[in-house]
Amino acid sequence: MFKVTSYFGALLSLLLSNTALQAQTAQMPAAEEFSTGEVLNSTPVMGDYYVKGTFGDWTLRCLKTEQAQDPCQLVQLMHSADGSPVAEYNLNPIQSDGLVLAGANVITPLETLLTQQLTIQVDDQNAKIYPFAFCMQMGCVARIGLTQEDLDSYRSGAQAIITMFPAAAPTQPERLTLSLKGFTAGHAALMGAAEN
């Protein structure tokens, strides 16, 4: 009895799968039901950020405006040990007062302990401490005035360590690596874009 039942079961299974395959073939959709996609316009529109160039670990990011020259900044995202983006460093051309030649913003998470401030140490040089200026929806901002000495150390350095403290763990500093690979070329491109 078992052999007969398994034979009929196998035959029934084969017939059902064959019927399903025929039904699937009969109901196969026509090619015109599928989209081949459209090419998106790669030209940025007003108010969009776009990448003007990449220099090592730095990106020259610009904002499309109605001006003859779009404002740009040199940007790098810094990541935690697990690879998650944590903070942004963006360098901006400024109207120099003779001492400060460039301005940078370091944007950290809202949960940053502001009273501990932020430190930046390029390679084995002495660290500098900077206050946070304000917080906004996307994070808290420390505004960094870069002197000629600072710019020279960025150009000749390999990396900077940026240290901040989470409010939830005020005794556990978060140290982020800012790569200086490509900084010299990126800074030159930023200043060239600002002058044009």
Could you describe each region identified by the protein language model?
Residues 19-23:
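Sec/Tat signal peptide C-region and signal peptidase I cleavage site
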Residues 24-196:
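A generic "folded-domain core" signal
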